[in-house]
């Protein structure tokens, strides 16, 4: 018998006699917190948010949000988006039925050329305005500083989150593909370490 045939038969018989290989399941993708069952909502419907935003920021208006067909999570939420301009969008995840906000996002798609600086400045204005809408005690200057701190911490990170009070701030920096800034409510819980003494 030829050496090549012997090797083939040896490998073939070893393959048949060994236990079957089990498929390794890929690592679970992290689910965005607002997609989880029971995720909290802001106490604002999308219409109320838009009205508040536009009243507080007359030079930065949000157009009406349109529902987006998303079969992935239809049972839990409704997705909607509003085009601000060619490279800037607002999107939201809403609780099904109440249309209360689970996540409010501003996405900037970078453009090349001389208009890039102005386009980014406009995107940052919208992002800071979203912060002020959900945290109304912040001044314009404070919201801009907060945004800069978050963007610096989240630079070149696909996901960066920071919580303050009952709000989670999220930055998704995909470099040349775009930048998304989001605000999401979180559930606050009492510490279990309280000893009961007042």
Segments (PLM) and residue ranges:
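N-terminal leader/targeting segments
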Residues: 22-112
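Short, low-complexity, Pro/Ser/Thr/Gly-rich segments in the mature regions of secreted, periplasmic
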Residues: 177-198
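Residues at beta-strand starts and edge strands
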Residues: 99-102, 175-179
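Ser/Thr- (and often Asn-) enriched beta-sheet segments in non-cytosolic proteins
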Residues: 105-107, 168, 180-182
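Long, charged/polar, surface-exposed segments that mediate recognition or autoinhibition
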Residues: 93-152
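A cross-family detector of function-defining hotspots
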Residues: 57-94, 136-174
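Bacterial N-terminal signal peptides that target proteins for export
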Residues: 1-8
């Amino acid at each position: 018998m030829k050496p090549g045939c012997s090797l083939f038969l040896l490998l073939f018989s070893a393959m048949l006699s060994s236990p079957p290989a089990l498929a390794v399941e890929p690592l679970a993708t992290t689910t965005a917190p607002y997609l989880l069952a029971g995720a909290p909502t802001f106490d604002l419907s999308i219409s109320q948010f838009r009205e508040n935003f536009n009243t507080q920021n007359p030079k930065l208006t949000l157009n009406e949000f349109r529902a987006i067909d998303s079969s992935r999570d239809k049972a839990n939420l409704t997705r909607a988006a509003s085009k601000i301009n060619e490279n800037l969008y607002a999107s939201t995840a809403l609780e099904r039925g109440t249309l209360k906000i689970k996540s409010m996002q501003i996405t900037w798609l970078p453009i090349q050329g001389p208009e890039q600086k102005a386009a980014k400045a406009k995107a940052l204005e919208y992002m800071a305005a979203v912060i002020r809408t959900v945290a109304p005690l912040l001044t314009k200057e404070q919201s801009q500083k907060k945004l800069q701190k978050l963007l610096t911490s989240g630079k070149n990170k696909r996901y960066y989150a920071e919580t303050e009070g009952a709000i989670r701030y999220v930055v998704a920096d995909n470099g040349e593909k775009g930048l998304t800034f989001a605000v999401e409510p979180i559930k606050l819980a009492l510490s279990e370490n309280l000893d009961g003494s007042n």
